[in-house]
């Protein structure tokens, strides 16, 4: 690791949160530097993502669990800048999930797929202003959306109208069935 990256990594490992508190306890009990403990855990997770059973679940927990937790904290904070950061992540995560749905049957056979996917998701959620989610959103998703916004709005409106019509028809039929059922009960008593 370069000196600057190592210093940044060490600073990150000394920030106050539940994970660094756990690392501090492990460091105190074992006498092993928390950087080495963290790198060991990262190495074990990487190996598990390559060879472990349920690597897909672990990868999805990493890509979903932490961002969901931080998103809730962002919603509850008065700062709206972090809301935008995590909304951007979720847009990229959604687009990635849709693309992955169609390609997963082929990609999951590659031995390093889940490790690469996990690395991609970590890059997207990295705590930096130029993380992967921001980059992908600004360079790919936003231009595509702005180019096709009116067509997408039209499709969404049509789907919404059809869903409302269907819900209204089902409600009307349910009311008729209820009235008929109540009418038959009155006749039988």
Curated annotation (Swiss-Prot):
UniProt keyword list: Endoplasmic reticulum, Membrane, Sarcoplasmic reticulum, Transmembrane, Transmembrane helix
Transmembrane segments: 35-51, 54-74, 85-103, 106-123
Predominant place of localization: endoplasmic reticulum
GO cellular component, one term: endoplasmic reticulum
Biological process per Gene Ontology, one example term: regulation of intracellular transport
Tissue spec. comment: Expressed in heart (at protein level). Expressed in circumvallate papillae and testis.
One Pfam family here: TB2_DP1_HVA22
Cystine crosslinks: none
Annotated membrane topology: Multi-pass membrane protein
Database matches in InterPro entries: TB2_DP1_HVA22
Subunit-structure text: Monomer. Homodimer; maybe disulfide-linked. Homotrimer. Interacts with ATL1. Interacts with ATL2. Interacts with ATL3. Interacts with CKAP4. Interacts with RTN4 (isoforms A and B). Interacts with ZFYVE27.
Record text about domains: The short lumenal loops between transmembrane domains 1 and 2 and between transmembrane domains 3 and 4 may impart a wedge-like configuration, thus deforming membranes.
Role description: Plays an essential role in heart function and development by regulating the organization and function of the sarcoplasmic reticulum in cardiomyocytes.
Name this protein carries in UniProt: Receptor expression-enhancing protein 5
Organism listed in the record: Homo sapiens
